[in-house]
Amino acid sequence: MNHSLAVVVIASGVAYGTPLLYAALGELLAERSGVLNLGVEGMMLIGAVMGFWTVQRVHASTGASLAAAIGVAAVAGALIALIHAFLVITLRASQIVSGLALTIFAGAAGLSSYLGNDFNLAQNPARHQFHAVFPSSFQRWPIVGPIVFGQNVLVYVSWACVVAVSLYLTRTRPGLNVRAVGDSPAAADAMGIDVAAYRYAHTLVGGAFAGVAGATFTLAITPQWVDGITGGAGWIAIALVIFAFWRPELCLVGAYFFGALQALSPELQAREIHLGPTELWANSLPYLMTIVVLVLVSASSTRRWLGAPAALGLPYVREER
């Protein structure tokens, strides 16, 4: 069944937006604790290469191999995030400088590229990859078929994660505590909340989400390893958190919007529809988002206007009692 351009773009936008959504949810949790993580892009690339390496090396069933790959990607992302957490929480280094340094260290010209070459992963298709969960008969349904039933399991898990993160931040004691840590760490400390522990935990969880986001590229969207495969998606994810006003449900909307933009250009080309240099604009989007992010996070007045956590990007020094 041939679907309309709009349906195909939306369905592809959901798929392409899924890694953005995972990365944005992880960044949101870290920022809610007051930690700005500009190393998302590097963590995504480490997750991408380690997830792909795992699925190539684990000789098991498809489900077991993919589950192991996602687990390894999450751990790899969390380990890179641990470096960031140690630098900015324990050593109180600049969160902007640390994040940028980690992106360079682990990014397309750094550790992820070295690992990809050392493991000889380039130009090898994935032994296993995520496919659509529902049968093709469901996917042929008008409109909802490709959009809802034509997705892989990572898409459906991401929906559950949006609900879980939203409920966690608004309906649970630890979630309310982390919001207190991000808004007023001194007051949270006075109430007996361990500020450092909350910041460490949520930074590591954010890194794990970024690792899964990276593995989504190599195991679902483009089942192979290519240097810089994320293409600046980490920067878009950081911008998403800001534009979503630190709300998980709006991160979902924004992720799918940017995913649809990414899907639009190839679909237009496939249908021989020319609307100007859309590909050039799409390729420049990550760099534009980098500029936007750095401008927004550098101005305290802008952060307050957007509703950012009051202590975002600020180290906490506990007063002697």
Regions found by a protein language model. Give the residues of each.
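Membrane-interfacial amphipathic/re-entrant helices at transmembrane-helix boundaries
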Residues: 1-24, 36, 50, 57-69
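Helix-loop-helix "hairpin" substructures at the membrane interface of multi-pass membrane proteins
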Residues: 147-225, 248-249, 253
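Alpha-helical transmembrane segments within multi-pass membrane transporters and channels
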Residues: 62-109, 257, 262
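Hydrophobic alpha-helical segments embedded in the membrane of multi-pass proteins
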Residues: 17-26, 42-47, 78-82, 182, ...
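Short, non-helical or kinked segments that cap or interrupt transmembrane helices
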Residues: 28-47, 67, 89-102, 177, ...
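Transmembrane alpha-helical segments in multi-pass inner-membrane proteins
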Residues: 220-287
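Cytosolic-side transmembrane-helix boundaries in multi-pass membrane proteins
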Residues: 183-190, 194-197, 268-321
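Transmembrane helix-bundle core of multi-pass membrane transporters
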Residues: 106-171, 271-282, 306-321
